[in-house]
Structure formats: C-alpha cells, structure tokens
Amino acid sequence: INSLCNYYNVRYVMAFNTGFDYCKTKCRDLLKDREFIDIFLMACQIYAKRKSYIDFCRKNNYLSKSKKSIATSAESFYAFLTNNTEYAEEHTALEDSKIEMAIFLACLKAHKPFTKNQHYFDYCNREGGNRWEFSIPAIAK
C-alpha cells in the first residue's frame, strides 16, 4: 500500500473516525510520511454545532444510541448534507467511501477551519479539550 501511495503521490490519508481505523490497521506506517484527516472530527467541527444540523437531527430523530444527544455519525451527516431523511448507510467499503468523500467535500466547500493530523478522540481529550464538545442534547433546553 505504501508503494502505491508513493507512486501516486498520495499526500493525505482520510477516513471517518481515523482513530478506529488506525487502531485496527496493520498499515500504520501510511501516516509516517503523510498527513491525515479525520472526516469525523472535520464534520463535527464544521457542522455539529450548527443550528440547522441540530434542528435536522432533532426533527428527524438522528440521535445517539443513548438518545441523550444528537447523532454525529457518517449516516446522520450525509442525510443532513443531502437532505435525505430516508438515507440508510449500507456499510460496505465502497458505499462508505462514497459518503465519506461527499462529507469531506461538503466540509471543504464550507471554507471553515478544521484540524489535521489528529484523531477525534485525541482532539477531544487534548490538554484543555472537552470530550463532550460535540455532544449536543437531543432535546432543546
């Protein structure tokens, strides 16, 4: 994989929740000479606190498993960005990569700052960080 990345001059490695992928992969050296973008962190930084996203999630029941906060899944972000409340994630490698790319491109088009080279979990647990930063209550206060 590394030689293919070198051949095609890959500068960035991206995934939705890179922390999970990083822990599960045997190809950790991919990040040695490349930057990485956690699309999960990127989408949270750009969309999770927007009133339009929060309202969309509350109205359409996109909630966390505990039902205490709004969802921040690839499925909920994609449904919001495409305004498709019928969307159901297929959970195949190809389809997941397609929606992750769509989320990434939408984030880029927003022209907002985002963090590179940090996994969502590490960002939320950094010094001075707030692990609940993107935990928006499911019910409006």
Language model features with spans:
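Metal-dependent phosphoesterase core characteristic of DEDDh/y 3'-5' exonuclease domains
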Residues: C5-A140
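Flexible, surface-exposed loop/gating regions in the mature catalytic domains
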Residues: I1
